Amino acid sequence: MRVFLLFQTALSGSQSLETNGENKMKEQLEKLFNHNSLSFTETQDAFSEIFEGKVDPVVLGSFLTALKMNGYSADEIGGAATAMIGAAEPFTRDNSVDVGEIVGTGGDKLKTINISTISGIICATLGLHVAKHGNTAVSSKTGASDVLTQLGYNVRTSKEDTRKALEDEGFAFFFAQVYHKGMRFAAPVRKALATSTIFNILGPLTNPAHVNYELLG
């Protein structure tokens, strides 16, 4: 009987915690459903939960869809990007060297090659330092890592090798799956939605190398 009571108490506490989290997300969803934007803090909190794997996939799908249907506000983009950077794997580099990036948001449905990646390689051959941040294809035909893998480039190098490549060769790839591990919780939902989401905008804003300049397409 005592064991049963302890189990019941633990279960009750667990359900209470789950309900609090669900209620918070439901409030944000209700706000979006009524065509109201979220504040910077609300969005940051929501995406922090996402990157910790605390959001149910069905709820996450609804959340991403509602955000897209409303149109993204500056506070929503800023809050989400701040949460993503905060959850990212840290990377340090030589800040005395200017580093740039050429990047697109993806999701154009044109089924073309990943042009930004090829452009970045060309720029590196001309003496520029390019920190290419990217992922496998989610809402596009090809992603940056897809192109580089086909070219024989190792997209999962260590931080030290990545740093050396950036300094010595002028080009290094920062694989989103390595530096933004919390994205794995959103990946299946993004794949199922098969459309661009706010994550397409966040990618160019969250380069782990903290680039000095960026050409965004």
Predicted ranges, named:
Residues 22-111, 126, 130:
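Acidic, glycine/proline-rich low-complexity segments that act as flexible tails and inter-domain linkers
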Residues 101, 130-134, 155-158, 173-175, ...:
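General beta-strand structural signal in soluble alpha/beta enzymes
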Residues 6, 13-24:
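Short, Lys/Arg-enriched N-terminal segments with co-localized hydrophobic residues
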Residues 64, 113-169:
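A glycine-rich phosphate/pyrophosphate-binding beta-strand-loop-alpha-helix module
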Residues 161-217:
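Phosphate/diphosphate-binding glycine-rich loops and adjacent basic-rich segments that engage nucleotide
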Residues 104-109, 134-140, 179:
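Acidic, glycine-rich active-site loops and adjacent beta-strand->loop/helix elements
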